[in-house]
């Protein structure tokens, strides 16, 4: 057999030509110790703060403490599989999450992975979870209403698109119920074919709640047809602390996609007390020095950098907005604890819910005296401004008088009238769950209350009067609601028509 030199040299030349010189470089470290969701890693000298790292078994982690001889990594998952001596490699990417309209109608975990069994998420891009909030120049003052559908909030503590309004109260006072009703109330705005400037997408972040509670919440959204314009981010009680810590940031990034693309979104963090507890756990295990109530010194910055990302952007930036409704759970109505005072000082107002009111049957259990909205009437339509100004004043007088009336039995007629009107208005502001009212319906009902049409009724008939009046306005007299809806104002002409309808209805009701 003859050896063909030319053929051999051709093969060798071909192989030399295709010889790849690029080698895959990966920086690898070793696990020194692991426990309680924290791993100490040696050898990752160039790792960035907040960078994702990957353990041997595929579990991800995030480098938080960069020390001289090791790196403190928080583990996004179970630490049982990770053992001392295993390798850890850099991913060269900061923690990111999927964003986009493909997430609507889905339930995802704290890193944006779907957990609802509906398959992979379609057509999305990825964004970093912890980015800087918009500066001062791109912002605009809040001027459009973000309707919750609850009379006591939309009339007395109005929320605007781009505002941050805290919902604060003890456990079992209806904080999540307010959030849920707000999501359900956006259904008429999110109809097919509606303009993007009208729509309001919803992001609900569940932190440290029971899985059954989150499942129930999602079920209600599905039944009411509200899941199609919502995203649920869940880091439940059984998830490790790092997942509960990162979930609000992931949710915020999902909401920011809408804000930055000229759309509107509302995000509900339920609740930030549990995120602070998870962050405290991580910080103590990373041996960071504790401060007040054993929280780390930067727990204020944790919440401020999250909530500052909710904003109303100006015309050059596309006019989008992200409204934040953080929830804080207090212990025995103590709003002077560390986390509640922090979040109160960051937000643009708060809705106080009280156990006593809840058990008196005033639901939503909003304490109107202590609750404020620092945006105020600029977040209301003209029609609502006209009727809400009056009810605010009357309720304030009523609260003052009710305190004094406990002492004196012989009250003059004017005081008696005031107390009578106040108790009727308080009754009027009650509202059952899952029955949000449109702005124009609230205006008509509150108008009837402040103009004295309820004064003669017994307290237990107020709800029936309201239901009957609304049925009449939605049916035969729908022109009045239509006029208020289109003009967003209560003109003299419409007010006269409304007066005639309410007067004739009051006669038949009596």
UniProtKB/Swiss-Prot annotation:
Where would you say this protein principally sits, based on its record?
membrane
Keyword Cytoplasm listed? The answer is no
| Entry keywords, A to Z | ATP synthesis, ATP-binding, Cell inner membrane, Cell membrane, CF(1), Hydrogen ion transport, Ion transport, Membrane, Nucleotide-binding, Translocase, Transport
InterPro entries in UniProt = ATP_synth_asu-like_sf (IPR023366), ATP_synth_asu_C (IPR000793), ATP_synth_asu_C_sf (IPR038376), ATP_synth_F1_a_nt-bd_dom (IPR033732), ATP_synth_F1_asu (IPR005294), ATPase_a/bsu_AS (IPR020003), ATPase_F1/V1/A1_a/bsu_N (IPR004100), ATPase_F1/V1/A1_a/bsu_N_sf (IPR036121)
Task: Tell me the domain of life.
Answer: Bacteria
Q: What does this protein do?
A: Produces ATP from ADP in the presence of a proton gradient across the membrane. The alpha chain is a regulatory subunit.
Protein name as annotated: ATP synthase subunit alpha
* Species this protein is from: Rhodopseudomonas palustris (strain ATCC BAA-98 / CGA009)
């Amino acid at each position: 057999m003859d050896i063909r030199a030319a053929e051999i040299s051709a093969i060798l030349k071909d192989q030399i030509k295709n010889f790849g010189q690029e080698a895959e470089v990966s920086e690898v470290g070793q696990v020194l110790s692991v426990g309680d969701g924290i791993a100490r890693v040696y050898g990752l000298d160039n790792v960035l703060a907040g960078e994702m790292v990957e353990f041997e078994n595929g579990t991800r982690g995030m480098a938080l403490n960069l020390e001289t001889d090791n790196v403190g990594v928080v583990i996004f998952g179970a630490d049982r599989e990770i053992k001392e001596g295993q390798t850890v490699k850099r991913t060269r990417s900061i923690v990111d999450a999927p964003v986009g309209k493909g997430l609507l109608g889905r339930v995802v975990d704290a890193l944006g992975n779907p957990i609802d069994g509906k398959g992979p998420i379609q057509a999305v891009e990825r964004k970093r979870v912890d980015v800087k909030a918009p500066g001062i120049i791109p912002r605009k003052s809040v001027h459009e209403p973000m309707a919750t559908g609850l009379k006591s909030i939309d009339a007395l503590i109005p929320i605007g698109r781009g505002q941050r309004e805290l919902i604060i109260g003890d456990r079992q006072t209806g904080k999540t119920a307010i959030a849920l009703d707000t999501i359900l109330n956006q259904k008429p705005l999110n109809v097919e074919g509606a303009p993007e400037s009208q729509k309001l997408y919803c992001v609900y972040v569940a932190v440290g709640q029971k899985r059954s509670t989150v499942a129930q919440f999602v079920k209600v959204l599905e039944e009411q047809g509200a899941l199609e314009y919502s995203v649920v981010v869940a880091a439940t009680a059984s998830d490790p602390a790092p997942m509960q810590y990162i979930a609000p940031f992931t949710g915020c990034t999902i909401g920011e996609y809408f804000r930055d693309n000229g759309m509107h979104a509302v995000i509900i963090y339920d609740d930030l007390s549990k995120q602070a507890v998870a962050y405290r756990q991580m910080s103590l295990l990373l041996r960071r020095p504790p401060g007040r109530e054993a929280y780390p010194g930067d727990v204020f910055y944790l919440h401020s950098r999250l909530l500052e990302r909710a904003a109303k952007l100006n015309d050059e930036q596309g006019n989008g907005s992200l409204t934040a409704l953080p929830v804080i759970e207090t212990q025995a109505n103590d709003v002077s604890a560390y986390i509640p005072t922090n979040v109160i000082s960051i937000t643009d107002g708060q809705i106080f819910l009280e156990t006593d009111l809840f058990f008196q049957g005033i639901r939503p259990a909003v304490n109107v005296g202590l609750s404020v909205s620092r945006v105020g009437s600029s977040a209301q339509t003209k029609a609502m401004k006209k009727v809400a100004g009056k009810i605010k004043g009357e309720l304030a007088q009523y609260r003052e008088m009710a305190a004094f009336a406990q002492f004196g039995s012989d009250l003059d007629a004017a005081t008696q009238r005031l107390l009578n009107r106040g108790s009727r208005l308080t009754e009027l502001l009650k509202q059952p769950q899952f029955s949000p009212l449109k702005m124009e319906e609230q205006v008509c009902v509150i108008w009837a209350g402040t103009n004295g049409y309820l004064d003669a009724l017994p307290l237990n008939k107020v709800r029936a009067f309201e239901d009957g009046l609304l049925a009449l306005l939605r049916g035969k007299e729908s022109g009045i609601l239509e006029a208020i809806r289109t003009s967003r104002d209560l003109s003299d002409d419409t007010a006269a028509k409304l007066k005639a309808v309410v007067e004739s209805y009051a006669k038949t009701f009596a």
